């Protein structure tokens, strides 16, 4: 029996509609619209696409969106000075610096310079630490978006064996913390993992984020598993595929997220949720 498709596009639209309704309500109450600053350094084509989509969604939900497109020659100290300025700006609730940054700029130093209550990407060590201590504030967008998908599909995660393939700071590590919080027994696999197939065949819930097309054979999927594919890979043919062999996996899983249209749309939707949360929970009282 074919798996149910986890429709990230529809759920992301629901989230955006909820945020837009709340923004309309805020304005009716005489409050300001949330503000998001999006900083792009250099001219990486993929980064430009991501940034454009983020700005577009900001406009859709009624946020104030401020763009800072800096030349590739921007120095680290110039970028840090801009972040300091945005940290102090009361009209800005969220600061997003598009990664990766050009050579010569330290990603970690830049992330740590953003005020934790404006870190809407959820990458600051303070926010990761809060998640680790089971008291999350602003949460990494892709992992939190996946949890939202599971919640909206009423999937009970308590007691499931969850396996995360990939241990990046952006997805894999925070995803493992989110799944622990959701009651899973969680395993994180990475490039040093031995017998990856064994782990995947025992996964009730599988999240794959490695950026390699078709990396996980569909036949490895445990029958009835819940499968979330974070990979977005463009083949030479132009086709966009995930990290999992979709067709075979779909025949074995109970739920599966497609690529495109699965996890991807949730990342930007969660960014918008985080910005609204930062505005309402941390910054409203300062007005």
UniProtKB/Swiss-Prot annotation:
Keywords: Amino-acid biosynthesis, Histidine biosynthesis, Hydrolase, Methionine biosynthesis, Multifunctional enzyme, NADP, One-carbon metabolism, Oxidoreductase, Purine biosynthesis. Pathway: One-carbon metabolism; tetrahydrofolate interconversion. One of its GO terms (cellular component) is cytosol. Its EC number is 1.5.1.5, 3.5.4.9. SUPFAM superfamilies: Aminoacid dehydrogenase-like, N-terminal domain, NAD(P)-binding Rossmann-fold domains. One of its GO terms (biological process) is methionine biosynthetic process. It catalyses: (6R)-5,10-methylene-5,6,7,8-tetrahydrofolate + NADP(+) = (6R)-5,10-methenyltetrahydrofolate + NADPH; (6R)-5,10-methenyltetrahydrofolate + H2O = (6R)-10-formyltetrahydrofolate + H(+). NADP(+) binds at residues 166-168, 232. It holds the Pfam family THF_DHG_CYH. It comes from the Bacteria. Gene3D superfamilies: Leucine Dehydrogenase, chain A, domain 1 (3.40.50.10860), NAD(P)-binding Rossmann-like Domain (3.40.50.720). One of its GO terms (molecular function) is methenyltetrahydrofolate cyclohydrolase activity. The keyword Transferase does not apply. Belongs to the tetrahydrofolate dehydrogenase/cyclohydrolase family. HAMAP family: THF_DHG_CYH. This is Bifunctional protein FolD. It comes from Pectobacterium atrosepticum (strain SCRI 1043 / ATCC BAA-672).
């Amino acid at each position: 029996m074919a798996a149910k498709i986890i429709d990230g596009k529809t759920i992301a639209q629901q989230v955006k509609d909820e945020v837009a309704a709340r923004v309309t309500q805020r304005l009716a109450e005489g409050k300001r619209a949330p503000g998001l600053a999006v900083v792009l350094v250099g001219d990486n084509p993929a980064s430009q696409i991501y940034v454009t989509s983020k700005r577009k969604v900001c406009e859709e939900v009624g946020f104030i969106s401020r763009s800072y497109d800096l030349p590739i020659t921007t120095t680290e100290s110039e970028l840090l000075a801009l972040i300091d300025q945005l940290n102090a700006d009361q009209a800005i609730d969220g600061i997003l610096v598009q990664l990766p940054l050009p050579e010569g700029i330290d990603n970690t130093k830049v992330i740590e310079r953003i005020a934790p209550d404006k870190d809407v990407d959820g990458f600051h060590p303070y926010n990761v630490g809060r998640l680790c201590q089971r008291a999350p504030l602003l949460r990494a967008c892709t992992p939190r978006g996946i949890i939202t998908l599971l919640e909206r599909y009423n999937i009970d995660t308590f007691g499931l064996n969850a396996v995360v393939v990939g241990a990046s700071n952006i997805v894999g590590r925070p995803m493992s913390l989110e799944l622990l919080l959701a009651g899973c027994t969680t395993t994180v696999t990475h490039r040093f993992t031995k017998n990856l197939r064994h782990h995947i065949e025992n996964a009730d819930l599988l999240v794959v984020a490695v950026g390699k097309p078709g990396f996980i054979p569909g036949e490895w999927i445990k029958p009835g598993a819940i499968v979330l594919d974070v990979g977005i890979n463009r083949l030479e043919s132009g086709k966009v595929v995930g990290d999992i062999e979709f067709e075979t996996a779909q025949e074995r899983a109970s739920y599966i997220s497609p690529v495109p249209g699965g996890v991807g749309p949730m990342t930007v939707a969660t960014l918008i949720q985080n910005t609204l949360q930062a505005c309402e929970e941390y910054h409203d009282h300062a007005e």
